A protein has these predicted regions:
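Intrinsically disordered, low-complexity and often Lys/Arg-enriched segments
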Residues: 1-4, 78-79
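A short, structured beta-strand/loop element
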Residues: 16-52
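Charge-dense, helix-prone N-terminal extensions
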Residues: 2, 10-12
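Intrinsically disordered, low-complexity segments enriched in polar/charged small residues
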Residues: 12, 29-31, 70
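C-terminal structural segments of small proteins and small subunits
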Residues: 49-79
Length: 79
């Protein structure tokens, strides 16, 4: 199961139900995929296919939606 937290244009922000417990979010689009840690701070964990400007935009979107991502994580995992 991989619940979608939000969408922005071609980007889908989501997480996997059975993955590591450290708070993070995945992003996918037709052009690539990325994973961002949210703890201890928002930082790119890995990516494939995105250019520098897209990664910058994605990082800003994660920061802008950080509370929404945290709330979805807590609802889903019950922590």
């Amino acid at each position: 199961m991989s619940p979608t937290v939000f969408r922005e244009g071609p980007f889908r922000f989501f997480f996997f139900s059975r993955e590591e417990p450290r708070l993070h979010v995945h992003v996918t689009s037709p052009d690539g995929e990325a994973k961002f840690w949210l703890e201890p701070e928002v930082v790119l964990a890995r990516q494939h296919g995105f250019g520098a400007s897209e990664l910058e935009r994605l990082e800003h979107l994660v920061i802008d939606h950080e509370q929404e991502i945290r709330d979805a994580w807590q609802r889903h995992f019950g922590c």
